[in-house]
């Protein structure tokens, strides 16, 4: 059954062509832009699974930081991070207090959201990113003191290169 709005319908029961065009333009043009503006950035909506010690406070701060940056998180508490490192190809020298996995990449330590987004956007052929050593001023390690630090991209063989300097 066809429904028409009597207030806007012409004699033949249809909307006048001008109004139909305006309606379509507003619906597809402005409405589409509005919907696109509300949709989350696909990178920001990525699911990050974090493996961390149940007692680690800085890890919890890093998780909160990621959520504020638009990432969805799932936290898995573990007392055996060494096994998590081994299963995910994290070189011993780069090991930190938590390991995360996002879209097939591994994140080790306090990796900034901007570098995660860049990783997911550029999709380099690496295992993942690491911020070894828990540097002061990195996400989750905020405080009065701030150290400069490197975000390293690492390979399966343990080789790493500077991905970003902060």
For the regions a protein language model found, what residue spans apply to each?
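N-terminal start-of-chain detector that recognizes signal peptides
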Residues: 23, 45-46, 70-73, 79-80, ...
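Local sequence-structure signature of Cys/Sec-based thiol-disulfide redox active-site neighborhoods
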Residues: 41-69
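Flexible, glycine-rich phosphate/dinucleotide-binding loops
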Residues: 57, 82, 138
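Secretory/periplasmic and organellar redox-cofactor proteins
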Residues: 1-46, 137-166
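Stable alpha-helical elements in mature extracytoplasmic
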Residues: 55, 62, 77-80, 112-116
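Thiol/selenol-based redox catalytic cores and closely related redox-interacting motifs
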Residues: 87, 93-166
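N-terminal, post-signal-peptide region of Sec/Tat-exported proteins
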Residues: 63-102
